[in-house]
């Protein structure tokens, strides 16, 4: 007869938590003495430990949380008030031990206890799916490379190397990778999702996801910072690439490709399954818990399976970044010098604590004592910050993941409407052009998205200053932008009307987007100038 498991204890009415290891150890001791009947084992454990009220409840008051954010204007104050309200709701959840908000924090929805963007929590032996969001493993990845082409030509190649927008790659255009053949698909949270994994490789989606081309100035100080922090491989690769070309002040400039995206449809499906399971399991052992605060205990089978599924999605997302970068390097005949990256929508295990970040960059020290290397984009016209974490435990050792917003996308667009309520497309185009002057900005759909331009975000300088003020990370280098590709404005959100579209209509939408993309590339080819460094 198999030994008693954590799931058996849950089924018998115990609430998952710190007591579980002792319960399982006691059960194992009885089993060594020859007692194997599950019902009798449960009775013995009830005698030894007592039965708890199986219904867990919210705390009467929220536990305190730290704020690495300060207001500089009225919009900031209103935004921070909303962040505090939602964090206070969330931190009544009994399994959460600590919380923090970053300089880019902003509310992420209206449902009770919804963790804000820029929010982080520490949880004992449990995972809250909403606290990593549906865009699981949204992350950054950078490749420093040597190339001889122009910005325009490289962006043309980048446009061909990736894909943006709704949907995924058609079967004839898919990209293979060994990550698709891992023996993982029997996991109940991943079973049947092979198609989502296959169709979204070399695909970045929409919203704030991007592929950015820039320049990284490699100085002696930067290399020494990396070496001192223990990132020897990266420091050595950069040192070898600049040997004979570097001086004490200016350094050497390299092109750098930076991509930002999550796990696409694969992660969205996993999130839906995980959140449903969390609500189901939480309702079985607790009462009065808002759906956004539902959790999966990692000592149960469901929690362990979900954790395993998250790790796979992390590997899949890293493979997706690497595929896009390798396709780009092949098309441009460029040579990679080094690469690095980080997640900012994920769950990380440190001992028995599961750190959740929804738009928060890990900034602690790894198991070897090295400050984590991070990439923090602020907007498409501002430098992407290369950081080393300061491991500031007051703020759960996180840093921001971007600039954040002070108002919703809808509110941003409201200022660019005509008297009749229609969008003033000319005013939108002017605002985007003014905010990105001198940069080669491409929109996959052919039409710009104002809310993803610098107009839609907090001032970059403000967020950067607060990173330093609160001691979250050290900025050791910058990737200065040359150009960027984003999905752009594809019209009404397709996933809200997809059920009403025929396959032919869906193909027509994609074909129109392709034609706009081709026209845009043609215009850039006609006007490009050689700007290689």
Question: For each of these PLM feature ranges, what is it?
Answer:
Residues 69, 84-86, 94-101, 107-117, ...:
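Domain-length cofactor-binding catalytic modules of enzymes
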Residues 21-24, 39-43, 169-173, 476-481:
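Short coil/turn segments at secondary-structure boundaries
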Residues 145-147:
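Acidic, low-complexity central loop/insert segments
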Residues 1-52:
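Charged substrate- and nucleic-acid-binding regions of tRNA-handling and nucleotidyl-transfer enzymes
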Residues 78-79:
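A beta-strand/beta-hairpin structural motif
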Residues 45-75:
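Low-complexity, highly charged intrinsically disordered N-terminal segments
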Residues 142:
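N-terminal glycine-rich flavin-associated loop
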